[in-house]
């Protein structure tokens, strides 16, 4: 397990004892990520029973660059672009971290799955009101360009988009305001990004959203994907412990 200020609850098969494991690895972090090391934004686990590394991410929400901030027309107090710059630093560092993590997993014969809240919508299909959102944090051109830069058929694949290539959404986040959930005026900012072989093993996937706004517990909904893991094990030539 590797993390930045996060822990994992683990339990051995047949054992009722639950243990909290924490293992911070910050020495090898990209310079831009060191300021985030205590915020619990990332955890990574090598599964014992599958040749698979699973990571969970909570990427900073960010904000608008200073030149787009308009006092009196913002819900948050103008900050001159500080939150925007902080997010951009994270993006630069995390891109390098992903490259290193992919290479390490591949060297060990493991597939890689990175899941979580990326706080970036990649394409027009990922935002219901994309025309009016192009100057909004999470859908800025530079954020979308960054997201595209970490994807390729040979590195990481957006699994849900691969399963639903021409569909609006499926959205994973809706504002609490304006009846956005009932009208499905949402954003797709939560992802499964998988190594190519694992992505090909995905057989179904989408958003597990509540039936009504009254049932919501969060402004996000889980993104759920079913993978045919035996197919991955067979294609890699690896065998799971058994």
Give residue spans per PLM region.
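Active-site beta-strand/loop signature of hydrolases that rely on acidic residues for catalysis
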Residues: 54, 97-124, 159, 193, ...
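Catalytic metal-binding/acid-base residues of hydrolase active sites
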Residues: 58-60, 119-121, 164-165
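Metal-dependent phosphoester-hydrolase catalytic domains
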Residues: 18-30, 123-242
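A structure-centric signal for secondary-structure junctions around beta-strands
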Residues: 3-4, 39, 51, 109, ...
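Catalytic-core regions built around general acid/base machinery
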Residues: 93-104, 146-150
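Amphipathic alpha-helical interface surfaces
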Residues: 90, 94, 114, 143-146, ...
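Structured beta-strand-rich core segments of catalytic domains in phosphoester-bond hydrolases
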Residues: 1-67
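Surface-exposed cleft-lining segments at the edges of enzyme active sites
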Residues: 25-35, 59-95, 131-136
